[in-house]
Amino acid sequence: MRDMGEAAVETLLGAVRLPMKKLVDTSLQTRPDVALYEHATSSLYTVKAVVVLPPYDVLELLALLDMRSTESFRHTMRILLDGVFVDGAVLHATPPSSPHSAESMTLNWLAVQNAKVHLPNRDYVFLKYGNCYALCGQCSPRRPAFMPTTSSTPSRPLKDTVAVSVWESVDVTECGPLPNDLNTLRLHFRQTGYVLEYMPRSRDASHGICISFFMSEEVPSSRSVSSLGKAWVVRMAQSVANLHHALVHQYVAEGRQRQLDMPRPMKPTAASRCHCCSKRFSILRRRHPCHLCSELVCKRCLDKQFQVDLCATCRLPSSMSLFKYWAS
C-alpha cells in the first residue's frame, strides 16, 4: 500500500506540472472564489480547482485530511462535500512509518451523489495517502527533488515545503460492488487528491497557501467526457473551497474538547474592555464571548464567517493547531 501511495503521489505531482487550460463553460455552475483548469487525455478527464487560504501551517491541513476514524471521516467529508456526500467509512488505518513522520495512510469507502438525482450514486474504495515533503537539491530514484519532512528536523523555509493527500482506488476482494438494488455504481479514483503549497509574497515572507484539488473522470476509449460527467467532476473539484470551513470547524471542536478535558477558570463577565482591541465596552459597543477561548470582545473583533464566533486572536492562522496523528 505504501508503494502504491508513493507512486500515486508522484503521478499527482506530475499533474501539477501539466499545461492545463482555464475551464470556461457557461453551462456549468462555478464559484467565483475557485479557479478551474482542465486537461483531457484519451482515457482521463481532469479538473484542477485552486483556492488560496491564509498562511496556515500545511501540517494543520494535512492533519485535517488524515481522518483516520470513520467518525472523523464522515464528519469532515460531510463539510467538504456539502450536498454531495452520502456515506463513508474508514476500512483500515495504518500508523505512520516512523514516530516523527507526517505520513497518513488509510483505506476508505466513500459514496457520493451523481450529477443528477435520477442517476445511480457513485461509490469508491480507495487508498488515501498523505505526506509532507521538502524541496531540496538531492534526488531520489522514486521522488526526484522531494524528501519527507519530519518534526525532528529543523524547520525549512515555508516556500520549500509541499504537502500531498492523494486518493487512489484499489481493488479489495472483501469490498466488492454493492447489490444492484442499492442503485450505486462502483467507480475509480485516478489522479485525484490535494496538493498544498506555500505562496511566497516575497523572498522571506509567506502570503498564503495555494491548495489545488485534482478530480478526474475515467473516459471510455475513443470518447470524450460526457456533459454529466464533466458537471460532476467540476462540482466535486469545487469542494476545495470548503476546506477552510472544515479546518476552522475541526479547530473549534478540538478546542472545546480540550476545555472539557482540562476546564479553565471562568472569564469575568464584567470585563470593561475588549480583549483584542482594548476599547471600552458601552451601550453601542456590546460584549460578545468567543466560543473558543471565552474572552469578551467587541463586535468588530468577532469573526462569524463560519457560523462560529471566534475572536481576532483565535482566528489567526498562527493560532490554528489541530491534533497531530503522528504525535499520538
Question: How does the language model describe each region?
Answer:
Residues 1-328:
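Eukaryotic helix-grip
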